[in-house]
A protein has these predicted regions:
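Short S/T/G/P-rich N-terminal loop/turn motif that feeds into the first structured element of a domain
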Residues: 1-50, 59-68, 78-105
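A common structural junction motif
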Residues: 72-76
């Protein structure tokens, strides 16, 4: 599994309510994604950063879904380019679901 962190700069003056509205609008698109395991939608108004933390089956899946059309959506919605970081994620402890995911070695 791969954890991907996507970050972008927020427009000046954006509100918490506006961020939540943007995130809610994107929910159906991500719910239908067969390659994504989990997504956390994040923002910090104080630092002016927003983005997402994704859990994918593979880095290829992450790159396929975060293509040019995704970049254009971020540019259109927030006026900034997204940046991407990828991390190998062999173990996940999910206390809410009382689940542990361990990738085979």
């Amino acid at each position: 599994m791969i954890t991907e962190i996507v970050l972008f700069d927020l427009p000046n003056g954006i509100t918490r309510e506006a961020m939540i509205a943007q995130f809610r609008e994107s929910i159906p698109r991500w719910q239908q994604n067969p390659d994504m395991i989990r997504k956390h939608m994040i923002f910090d108004l104080a630092s002016g950063k927003g983005g997402g933390i994704y859990l994918w089956k593979s880095v290829e899946d992450a790159r396929r879904w975060h293509d040019e059309s995704f970049r254009q959506r971020v540019l259109s919605a927030f006026g900034s380019e997204p940046s991407y970081q990828y991390f190998d994620t062999p173990v996940i402890v999910d206390n809410a679901a009382r689940d542990i995911m361990i990738e085979a070695a």
